[in-house]
Amino acid sequence: MAETKVIYHLDEEETPYLVKVPVPANEIRLRDFKAALGRGHAKYFFKAMDQDFGVVKEEISDDNAKLPCFNGRVVSWLVSSETSQTDSAPPAAEVRPDPPPVPPPVPPPPAERTSGIGDSRPPSFHPNVSGSTEQLDQDNESVISMRRDRVRRRDSTEQGVARGVNGRAERHLSGYESSSTLLTSEIETSICDSEEDDAMSRFSSSTEQSSASRLLKRHRRRRKQRPPRLERTSSFSSVTDSTMSLNIITVTLNMEKYNFLGISIVGQSNERGDGGIYIGSIMKGGAVAADGRIEPGDMLLQVNDINFENMSNDDAVRVLRDIVHKPGPIILTVAKCWDPSPQGYFTLPRNEPIQPIDPAAWVSHSAALSGSFPVYPGSASMSSMTSSTSVTETELSHALPPVSLFSLSVHTDLASVAKVMASPESGLEVRDRMWLKITIPNAFLGSDMVDWLYHHVEGFQDRREARKFASNLLKAGLIRHTVNKITFSEQCYYIFGDLTGCENYMANLSLNDNDGSSGASDQDTLAPLPLPGASPWPLLPTFSYQYPAPHPYSTQPPAYHELSSYSYGMGSAGSQHSEGSRSSGSNRSDGGRGTQKDERSGVVGVGGGESKSGSGSESEYSTRSSIRRIGGGEAGPPSERSTSSRPPLHHPPSVHSYAAPGVPLSYNPMMLMMMPPPPLPPPGACPPSSSVPPGAPPLVRDLASVPPELTASRQSFHMAMGNPSEFFVDVM
């Protein structure tokens, strides 16, 4: 004879019951189910399908109504009438109805539900709650929440039916499995609805006295069903007060499938005692690696039922070793670490060099911040760096407009994109990598860089264009392969190139590409070096720092015709010229000659020596030195203005001095414009001559009297004066 299986849930019990009714599934009615069950005074809900809402719980009270059947089975929920009447109003004293008779095939309810633990009502329903707050601990509440877990997931689809099942509205959990979320949602829907109460109920499993006292002050209110919020899905079901701020998980490992646990532990200790044991590394093939939830850096709190909180490291290791050797599953309770590899919370940038302090740049930068003179964004030398130091990243960040992560596009230069990408807060995963047992520090994967470019740089049509952009970064030397491969691959590790000098690309510009093999290398060079032992700035006074330093600069640069009449005199800085293979690391000065062959922009050196460029050694490019005028009203014959045979003159401290005594200044057209006009020579002064007798001191010459063979220098100086916001350099 055909029979139908009926699965029914009784009240709030976790385990469902099964009864077989000797009636075919398509003909079974409510009276057949009642006859087989032998229970009265109950409400019957059945799983049904609604066209609008899908699966619902439908209440059927007509004995002749057919029961909905799914896959040959009927699913039902029974709510005793006594339970619903008891929950409708708070009783004066706790009344527990006698359990109804249970059919023979149904097992008895669990024994843990006695002595008040299984009571589903909040503490506010108990009249003697003040005397029973000690029983309201987190273990009891965790048991309650876990036993209601499965029933609540089934009872949350329909508001009205759910209210009939357990006496109050339930919340739909949207599939979250956390038991603490279940406990939190139960208290929220039955007690409170405000944000303040939500915060209270969120920690109800660990605040025992406070939760009980707050519940006493509130009346039970029925609330409408509302969707849950995602932020309430944290899981600390039985968190103690000492570890409530940590994310604690419990992992059960089946040791029958794996031969070993597969972890190495690290102990932490200091002068105050042991600080616990942590997961050092995880080995492949072990039980922990197969589970995947435990990571290096997690703190081991408990193994099986043995707590490590008040145990020394040696004892904890011994206990762990003994448990591993025993058969059976192993339960590990660990506290998750916050972040095993922080990307830049309190770490210094990797490419931040330690630079020497330049007081001159400090003073000029302070003046720029105070607004004393305008900062031209196009001039990378506004920081008045000396020729002995290069332009650093810190000063460039003040002189150049910053490039942020949100302003990158395909039109941004490669150096700026690489610099933003190399910053610790860029989001690119840069860390130490292992390749062929070789540690590559601060490396990143090619595919990660392509993804970063595609998501952070605007203008790419597809990912292929971002990959082409990454290939250009490799060709430009801004990123480098470990073995210096020139073709880009997304499966390779890369490191950042030298980004410190990427802003000095103007130094690579050249007006004349000379290779140094012809006589052209003797033309268009700097003024000669000073005599050995002589100060390169004999007329400059001692620098005195004044804070804030006054800068009587004009905001508008003077016209070039005014500058063309200036005389720039007395002083040159030794510099090294390099042009690819040609270098001048060994500058030599022939001090016995008086002719000045090398003149630049009307500038004559102090000494009578001629500077020549050596050959054969590599040297770096050095910046040009700007020239100071003679201050203090020096008006006389040129012979009186020479200083080769007399000590330096002493003048009051000048506010225009940007470098320490004896240190040459960097070549900057803006420095020339910042100086006031020099005094005009008296009418009796002799005009400067282009030829100087041997042994005589050099003369100051006007710009117009420069020989025509120095055309490149004159044109460069004209362009620099006509475009004061740009920086023109002749690379020798």
UniProtKB/Swiss-Prot annotation:
Composition bias, Polar residues: 202-213
Subcellular location as annotated: Cytoplasm; Cytoplasmic vesicle; Cell projection, Cilium; Nucleus
Domain DIX: 1-82
Residue intervals of the DEP domain: 424-498
GO annotations of cellular component type: cell surface; ciliary rootlet; cytoplasm; cytoplasmic vesicle; nucleus; plasma membrane
Composition-biased stretches (Basic and acidic residues): 146-157
CDD domains xref list: DEP_dishevelled (cd04438), PDZ_Dishevelled-like (cd06717)
Region (Disordered): 81-181, 195-237, 570-660
InterPro entries membership: DEP_dom (IPR000591), Dishevelled_C-dom (IPR024580), Dishevelled_fam (IPR008339), Dishevelled_protein_dom (IPR003351), DIX (IPR001158), DIX_dom_sf (IPR038207), Dsh/Dvl-rel (IPR015506), DVL2 (IPR008341)
Post-translational modifications reported in the UniProt record: Phosphorylated. Phosphorylation is controlled by frizzled proteins, correlates with the onset of embryo dorsalizing events and is higher in the dorsal half of early cleavage embryos. Phosphorylated on tyrosine residues in response to association with efnb1/ephrin-B1.
Subunit structure: Can form homomultimers. Interacts with prickle1. Interacts (via the PDZ domain) with ccdc88c/dal and dact1-B/dpr. Interacts (via the DIX domain) with ARP/Axin-related protein and dact1-A/frodo. Interacts with sdc4, possibly via fz7. Interacts directly (via the DEP domain) with efnb1/ephrin-B1. May interact indirectly with the phosphorylated ephrin receptors ephb1 and ephb2 via SH domain-containing adapters.
Name of this chain's protein: Segment polarity protein dishevelled homolog DVL-2
Organism: Xenopus tropicalis (Western clawed frog)
